Amino acid sequence: MKVNRILIYSLLLAGITITSCKDDNPSIDDYWLNYEIEEVKVTQDIPVGVYLYNPQNALETNVDQWTRITEEQDVAAGKLGPNTKPWYDLPEALEAGKYHLAADTIGARAMQKIIEWCHYGRIDFMVLPGINENANDIYPLNIGRDTAFIDMVRGLNDTLPKVELNGVKFALMVNMNSMCSDLNNNKLVENVDPTRKTYPVIETIPDINNPGMDIVVTTRVDTLIKRSDRICSYFKRISDYFSDPNYYHTGGRPVVVIADANKLYTQDSYRMYTAIRDTVRKHTGKEMYLIAQQGAWTPPERFHYFYLSGKVDAVTMKNMCAVGGAQYERVILFDQFVNENYKYNKEVFWSRYNIDFIPSASPGYSQYVATENNSNYPWMPKTQERFWTMCNVAKMNLGTNPMVLIDSFNDWAFDSCIEPTDPSYGKGY
């Protein structure tokens, strides 16, 4: 009997020990990032926008960058370019395949091809390259030469081949840094020195030497303009394009993307953004839908005193494939990390600020074209599979006003583009 009791106790102890070991051992099944990004079926139309870049200057004049785009890929030798050629099939081009997109004849034909591709890909609108302020003039001359490119896209430049948008809309992106580059924590928009501007005033007055006749007189007026008024005037000029029938609206509101929104240092962000909205509303009768661009992998709370307190309508992330310098750990479970990042940002924006989230999707990222020897940034080679996965991550994190922004159509400097290439050359698609 005693032997039986010992045997029973031994078996019980062994069972407990085995069970305890099984419970204590970690399982990969329990790991919070152990999941796959599944294909997301959509049940409604999701508006899709795409960023249009204007990188032609570097690609036309920088032979090294063009070589790094077109040369054969050799990972062992550190040659990480896409081995492709941007492709327009334009007979006017001086060199086949050379990139060109500007307000001229070749640029207009290239723009028409881009629109055809956007239409084929069912892209709803293009976000045009960021518009800079012209600090030397006042409204309506305060955005300078950017008007030539915008008018070309709109098909309103009579000196160029007419561009037809064919149902593809456009939206504008403002470059906040062009007005706020000198601002910081100790130099706010409210206390920075006003800008001295001289502008012409044209008047018609009686000609004292010829009774009954008039003469036109131009007078130069010297004035001081507060920085906050400059910013409002800049948005007023941007809003002149809202009446274009091809300008993209959501819910009846014109969409404006704000690049470098974190450069607007102000004592009261809400008051500053309210002044901007009031200026545009008074000028156009429209309420803007403002989308602030946030840097990839940055925490939302960092921008509390900027556009979040300013109550923009939505926030979007820049290219998440740009994982940052030496951030190699983000590459290992990249898809899951992006998804968790989006989930967190979306929840914070909505629950704390009542601001919507607009996910972005990118096909890849590489520093190689822009800076050949910069190995500090992990290489995220552009692939169709990555782009599909990022689109599914975006669909998993749609906001209350569903929309997705693709970064980008043609940012060749960082090989993060979906623009078609010459299919007969290298790894063309």
Regions found by a protein language model. Name each.
Residues T17-S20:
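C-terminal motif of bacterial Sec signal peptides marking the signal peptidase cleavage site
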Residues N25-Y429:
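Glycan-processing catalytic domains of CAZymes
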